[in-house]
């Protein structure tokens, strides 16, 4: 009998609520907000990015089918944090505040993301 391993969790540079820009793929250049992070697969769901359509069958008699749209996840390596003040995407670095808290900072602008 083998022990069941817990799934690998990846360290991600983005968090829920961050503003990001897509840097590769079909939606390259789009800016949106992270709705959900999936650390086990290192993926993020971004508002208005990678929108898919799904045809839903009617569930009950007399009900009509629907076409639903939803945001599918994209890999976190395809997104970069975005500064809304400077209108530029940037990598991040980790720094410490005067109080000793570890915060994320945009490398290009020096803007602190975690407040």
Curated annotation (Swiss-Prot):
Gene3D superfamilies: 2.30.30.30. Pfam families: KOW (PF00467), ribosomal_L24 (PF17136). InterPro entries: KOW, Rib_uL2_dom2, Ribosomal_uL24, Ribosomal_uL24_CS, Ribosomal_uL24_KOW, Translation_prot_SH3-like_sf. One of its GO terms (biological process) is translation. GO terms for molecular function: rRNA binding; structural constituent of ribosome. It comes from the Bacteria. The keyword rRNA-binding applies. CDD domains: KOW_RPL26 (cd06089). GO terms for cellular component: ribonucleoprotein complex; ribosome. Keywords: Ribonucleoprotein, Ribosomal protein, RNA-binding, rRNA-binding. Part of the 50S ribosomal subunit. Belongs to the universal ribosomal protein uL24 family. One of two assembly initiator proteins, it binds directly to the 5'-end of the 23S rRNA, where it nucleates assembly of the 50S subunit. One of the proteins that surrounds the polypeptide exit tunnel on the outside of the subunit. This is Large ribosomal subunit protein uL24. It comes from Crocosphaera subtropica (strain ATCC 51142 / BH68). The lineage of its organism: Bacteria, Bacillati, Cyanobacteriota, Cyanophyceae, Oscillatoriophycideae. The gene is rplX.
């Amino acid at each position: 009998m083998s022990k069941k391993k817990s799934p690998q969790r990846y360290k991600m540079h983005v968090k829920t609520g961050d503003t990001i820009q897509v840097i590769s793929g079909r939606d390259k250049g789009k800016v949106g907000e992270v709705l959900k992070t999936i650390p086990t697969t290192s993926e993020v769901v971004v508002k208005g990015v990678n929108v898919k359509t799904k045809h839903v069958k009617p569930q009950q008699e007399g009900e009509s089918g629907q076409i639903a749209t939803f945001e599918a996840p994209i890999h976190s390596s395809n997104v970069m944090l975005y500064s809304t003040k400077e209108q530029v995407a940037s990598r991040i670095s980790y720094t410490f505040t005067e109080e000793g808290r570890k915060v994320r900072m945009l490398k290009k602008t020096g803007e602190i993301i975690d407040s």
